C-alpha cells in the first residue's frame, strides 16, 4: 500500500544513521555507583565516610582522612540477565564479562609545624563508572509503525530529490532507497510527489531487535585533600573521562501475512557502530565532623566536557517480491569502503551529593572503630546534557540547528531526579561484615516509561598487618525502556526492560 508520511518540520528525529540519538545522553549519566568492593558492599555510599580510595570519584574530601600510603586493586566479574516485553511478546538475553572497580594509590602524610592543616593526601585512581558489556534482544508483532518510517521522515523533511535519496544518506535512507525498501510516490502525471515505504504496516510485521554492546565508561581522577584538625576535610579531583562503546546491531522486519504478492517479504538492517570519547571534569567536596561520631558531607560534580568520535558501517538487504526482488546495499559501496565518521562534543549533567554518617565508637584511630551507618542523597539533572558541533562544523548552520533541536528534545524527554543510597558495616577485630542498598529514580519525564534501578549488596572484609582484602556481591534490579527506532509523526513504541545485573568484586590493598 502506497502512502506518504509527512514530517512536522519542528520535530527532531534521528536524521541519519550517523546522527546522535537523545538516548546517548544517558550513556554517561544514568549509572549505578561503582567503586572498591567495600564501597559497593555498602550500596555505593561514600559522600561523608572517607578513608577509601573510591572517595576520589565521589567526594574527594574523603581522601583527606588518609594518614598513610595505600595501593588498591579491584578486579570484578559481571552477570547480565535481561528480560524484555515488546508489544506483548516476552524475550530474554544474557551476557557476562569482566570489569573492575576503583584501583590506584594514595600518598598521605601529616603536616609538621603550627599549620592548621593536620594532614594532606594525594590520590591517583581509575574507576569503571559504567560497563557496556550487554545484550539487548527483543521481538514482537507491530502493525502500528515501521523502522522504515524514519527514512521517510528524513527524505521528506529534507525535500530530497531522487539523486539525493540515492547518494546523500549513505548509512540509512540511501540504502533503503537503493533496495526499493523505500521508493518514490508518483502523481497521476508521473511526477514525484514524495516517498513511500514498501512495508505493509497496516497488516503488520514481525520485528526483531538484537544489539550486542561492549566497552565501558572509565574515569581517571587526580585528587588532593586537606585535613584541618581532624574536623574539616576539603578536597577536589581533576577527572579525565574516557568512553569506549561498541555496538553490533541486527534489526529485521518480516511480513506477517502469507500473501506473496503484497510486494514485501522482509528486510534486514545491520550496523557496526563505535563511539570513543575523552574529556575533562572536576569534583569538589567537603566533610565536617560536628562531633566525633558524626560526619556530614557535600560534593559537587561539574559537567564532564567530552569530545566524541563516532564511526559506523551499515547495510540493508530487502526482498520486495515482484516489486524489485531481493536487493542489497552497503555503506562501504557508497563511501569507498570507509566507515562514516562524525566528531562532536557532549556536556554531561552535573550532580550534587549530600551525605551523613554515624560512626560508633569514633576515635582518631580508625582501627578502633566498630561500626558505621551512612546515607547519600544524590541529585542528577539528566536534562542538562548537551550536544555540540566541533571543529569546522561549529559554524555550520545546518548542524547548529540540528544540535539545538536535539538539545531541546533532551530537555523535553528527560528530567532531574534523586538517587538514594544507604549502607553500613560491622567490624569484629580483623573481620568486617557489610550491607547496603540504593534506589536510582527514572531519568524520563514521561511517567508512562517505567524506569528505575534498585541495588542490594553485601560483602565481607579482612584487615590485618597492613594488608586488606574485600569481597562483595552487588545485585542490580533494572527497569528501563529500549527504543528500536524513534519517529516524529507518531508516538514511539518501545520495549519494557526488566531484569538483573550482578557484580562480584574483589579489592586487594596494601598499606605502605
Features from the language model and the residues they span:
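Alpha-helical transmembrane segments and their juxtamembrane interfaces
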Residues: 12-13, 69, 431
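Active-site-proximal flexible loops/turns
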Residues: 9, 66, 244-246
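N-terminal targeting signals for Sec/Tat export/insertion, comprising classic cleavable signal peptides
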Residues: 30-48
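Outer-membrane beta-barrel translocator/receptor signature
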Residues: 37, 49-58, 64-143, 215-218
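Outer-membrane beta-barrel porins/channels
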Residues: 20-34, 108-512
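Bacterial Sec-dependent N-terminal signal peptides
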Residues: 1-25, 512
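Short hydrophobic/aromatic segments of transmembrane alpha-helices and their interfaces
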Residues: 45-46, 52-53, 278
Amino acid at each position: 500500500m502506497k502512502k506518504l508520511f509527512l514530517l512536522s518540520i519542528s520535530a527532531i528525529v534521528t536524521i541519519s544513521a550517523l546522527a546522535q540519538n537523545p538516548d546517548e545522553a544517558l550513556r554517561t549519566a544514568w549509572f549505578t555507583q561503582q567503586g572498591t568492593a567495600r564501597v559497593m558492599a555498602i550500596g555505593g555510599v561514600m559522600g561523608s565516610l572517607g578513608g577509601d580510595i573510591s572517595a576520589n570519584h565521589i567526594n574527594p574530601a574523603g581522601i583527606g582522612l588518609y594518614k598513610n600510603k595505600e595501593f588498591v586493586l579491584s578486579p570484578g566479574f559481571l552477570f547480565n540477565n535481561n528480560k524484555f516485553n515488546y508489544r506483548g511478546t516476552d524475550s530474554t538475553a544474557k551476557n557476562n564479562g569482566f570489569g573492575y572497580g576503583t584501583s590506584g594509590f594514595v600518598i598521605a602524610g601529616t603536616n609538621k609545624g603550627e599549620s592548621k592543616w593536620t594532614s594532606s593526601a594525594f590520590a591517583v585512581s581509575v574507576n569503571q563508572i559504567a560497563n557496556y558489556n550487554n545484550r539487548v534482544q527483543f521481538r514482537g508483532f507491530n502493525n502500528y509503525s515501521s523502522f522504515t518510517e524514519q527514512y521517510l521522515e528524513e527524505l521528506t523533511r529534507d525535500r530530497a530529490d531522487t539523486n539525493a535519496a540515492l547518494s546523500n544518506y549513505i548509512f540509512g535512507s540511501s540504502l533503503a532507497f537503493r533496495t526499493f525498501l523505500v521508493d518514490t510516490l508518483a502523481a497521476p502525471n508521473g511526477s514525484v510527489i514524495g516517498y513511500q515505504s514498501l512495508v505493509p504496516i497496516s497488516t503488520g510485521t514481525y520485528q526483531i531487535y538484537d544489539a550486542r554492546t561492549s566497552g565501558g565508561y572509565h574515569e581517571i581522577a587526580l585528587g588532593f585533600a586537606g585535613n584541618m584538625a581532624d574536623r574539616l576535610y576539603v578536597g577536589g579531583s581533576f577527572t579525565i573521562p574516557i568512553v569506549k562503546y561498541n555496538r553490533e546491531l541486527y534489526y529485521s522486519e518480516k511480513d506477517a501475512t502469507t500473501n506473496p504478492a503484497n510486494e514485501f517479504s522482509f528486510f534486514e538492517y545491520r550496523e557496526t557502530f563505535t563511539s570513543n570519547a575523552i574529556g575533562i571534569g572536576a569534583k569538589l567536596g567537603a566533610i565536617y565532623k560536628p562531633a566525633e561520631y558524626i560526619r556530614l558531607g557535600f560534593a559537587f560534580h561539574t559537567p564532564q566536557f567530552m569530545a566524541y568520535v563516532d564511526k559506523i558501517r551499515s547495510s540493508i538487504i530487502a526482498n520486495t517480491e515482484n516489486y524489485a526482488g531481493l536487493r542489497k546495499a552497503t555503506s562501504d559501496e557508497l563511501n569507498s569502503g570507509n566507515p562514516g565518521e562524525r566528531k562532536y562534543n557532549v556536556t554531561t549533567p552535573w550532580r550534587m551529593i549530600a551525605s551523613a554518617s554515624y560512626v560508633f565508637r569514633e576515635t582518631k584511630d580508625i582501627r578502633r572503630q566498630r561500626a558505621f551507618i551512612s546515607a547519600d542523597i544524590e541529585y542528577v539533572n539528566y536534562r542538562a546534557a548537551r550536544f555540540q558541533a566541533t571543529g569546522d562544523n561549529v559554524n555550520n548552520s545546518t548542524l547548529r540547528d540540528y544540535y539545538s533541536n536535539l538539545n531541546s528534545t533532551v530537555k523535553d524527554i528527560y528530567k532531574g531526579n534523586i538517587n538514594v543510597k544507604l549502607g553500613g558495616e560491622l567490624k569484629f577485630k580483623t573481620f568486617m561484615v557489610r550491607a547496603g542498598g540504593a534506589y536510582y529514580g527514572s531519568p524520563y519525564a514521561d511517567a508512562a516509561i517505567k524506569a528505575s534501578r534498585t541495588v542490594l549488596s553485601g560483602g565481607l572484609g579482612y584487615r590485618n598487618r597492613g594488608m586488606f582484602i574485600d569481597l562483595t556481591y552487588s545485585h542490580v534490579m533494572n527497569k528501563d525502556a529500549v527504543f528500536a527506532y524513534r519517529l516524529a509523526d507518531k508516538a514511539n513504541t518501545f520495549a519494557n526492560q526488566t531484569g538483573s545485573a550482578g557484580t562480584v568484586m574483589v579489592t586487594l590493598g596494601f598499606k605502605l
